[in-house]
């Protein structure tokens, strides 16, 4: 057995509490231990408490992890990312700065389809190398788990290739990856005007191959009238359910109450985006127990002012989740701290609510609430030591990489260079 102890934490932000996702006022309860400490055994948390209590229980040969009187939080859980792709869309970023809209660029063959073309051309090594670079970006912000979508292949072979890259990255044990199949991200060039044929490909070939090799836990669909309308989206998601995959849905990014109602109907784990969802859609999601995953960085990067109604969701008792939506087009950021800042300034979530949304609530949205998301005995020792004096500074000092060191299952996977 390997034993270690984390000591000298100015604030140990544990988020300890009752099982289940947090809602309402409970989202502000972080269970902070000043001068806290933690004992770790074989990659799991063995004990948490005041430093004096933990020190008394240590054996003489216990390895000490010195937090240096910094703030320690659970590793952030980013519940919506697209981390495997080739190239960038910096040219499109410039086009948007000159006045072009996201929809106009997509209609001209850019957007998701441009990344699909570049990704199909890339070799396996190129894809894995790029994704490892992004792994470093996630770690620098204190993230230890990401939900990782495919969606830039849009052919049987290329979707499987992306999911196998995600499996490879997960096996490297620097970051935890939760794989999601997103073959219904866009209609590829060769199927333009033939959506029924492409949906058949997704249902008849892609999904069975994904399920046979256990390459994904979830299936997602970008459900919008001009991408995958309700009937094709429903058919894909029901086929995924029949194969044992759980559901996540890109919902109501542009069209109100379009996909939120579908997410509620099918009992999806999450409905993501929700920028255009009205009270009708929110009521349906709440009643069905679907967790909202809000992506303020994509709203910011697209130059929109339509942020999701986070305060309304919290008032309704919904277990809100925040995520980066890391992707090469609408949200090229892997920074959860930046998302925390946007959540406070643009959606008026408190720093405590935002922390809950990227830890405990995010863990439950991925079916991992009993294993990660808080610093409690029995859970994985996934945590980050941050360069700050108070957890609120993670959102307050925006645009920085706060993590001094990041640990996954008790092992250091990132340390800031001196």
Curated annotation (Swiss-Prot):
Subcellular location: Cytoplasm
UniProt binding sites for Zn(2+): 80, 82, 250, 325
Keyword Electron transport in annotation: no
Enzyme class at the top of the EC tree: hydrolase
Enzymatic reactions: 4-imidazolone-5-propanoate + H2O = N-formimidoyl-L-glutamate
Pathway field: Amino-acid degradation; L-histidine degradation into L-glutamate; N-formimidoyl-L-glutamate from L-histidine: step 3/3
Domain of life: Bacteria
An individual GO BP term: L-histidine catabolic process to glutamate and formamide
Family annotation (SUPFAM superfamilies): Composite domain of metallo-dependent hydrolases, Metallo-dependent hydrolases
Keyword tRNA-binding among UniProt keywords: no
EC number: 3.5.2.7
GO molecular function, one term: iron ion binding
Cofactor annotation remark: Binds 1 zinc or iron ion per subunit.
Pfam families associated with the record: Amidohydro_1
UniProtKB keywords: Cytoplasm, Histidine metabolism, Hydrolase, Iron, Metal-binding, Zinc
Amino-acid positions noted as binding N-formimidoyl-L-glutamate in the UniProt annotation, renumbered to this chain: 152, 327, 329
Cofactors, names only: Zn(2+); Fe(3+)
Residues the record lists as binding 4-imidazolone-5-propanoate: 89, 152, 185, 253, 330
Ligand binding (Fe(3+)): 80, 82, 250, 325
Cellular component annotations (GO), alphabetically ordered: cytoplasm
Family listed: Belongs to the metallo-dependent hydrolases superfamily. HutI family.
Function field: Catalyzes the hydrolytic cleavage of the carbon-nitrogen bond in imidazolone-5-propanoate to yield N-formimidoyl-L-glutamate. It is the third step in the universal histidine degradation pathway.
Protein name listed in UniProt: Imidazolonepropionase
Gene: hutI
